[in-house]
Each structure stands twice: as structure tokens, then as C-alpha cells.
Amino acid sequence: MTGFSIDFVSPARFNSLAAEISFESQILCRIDKEREDGVFEIEFFHEARLLGAEVKMKFSVQDLLKVVDQACADLRDIPA
């Protein structure tokens, strides 16, 4: 999962922690479980923080799925 990072955040309007996934310091998305039924949702931030042209936003699908799975597993492990 080279280039990816997971940061846990606590937006003021959220009841629980969320996980932000970045690639080469460019934020990609945030995963949260704010729904009443506890289902994870993903919100993409395609223009939240634009870096220079040296950051190529292209990576393997398998690596992205691994980091999304890891973020969801980490969020499940956090006590409510």
C-alpha cells in the first residue's frame, strides 16, 4: 500500500471517529459510520487539497481496496 496513509479524525458534527485516506499526502476520501444502522459510508474529496503536478493520482485498485478495508477494520475496532 505504498503511498497511502490513514488518519483518524473527529469532525465536530460526527458522533464517532472517521478515517481519512490519503495518497502521497493528497486526501482521497473519508470513511465514517454515522448512519443509524452503522453502515460505513465513503465520501470522496477530489478537490479538497490539490498538490503539484508531481503527485500522480493513479494507483492499483488492489492497493486502494486494501487501504479501504484496513480503515474499516480499524474503525470497527474503536470502542463506541
Positions of PLM-derived features:
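Terminal leader/tail segments of proteins
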Residues: 1-80
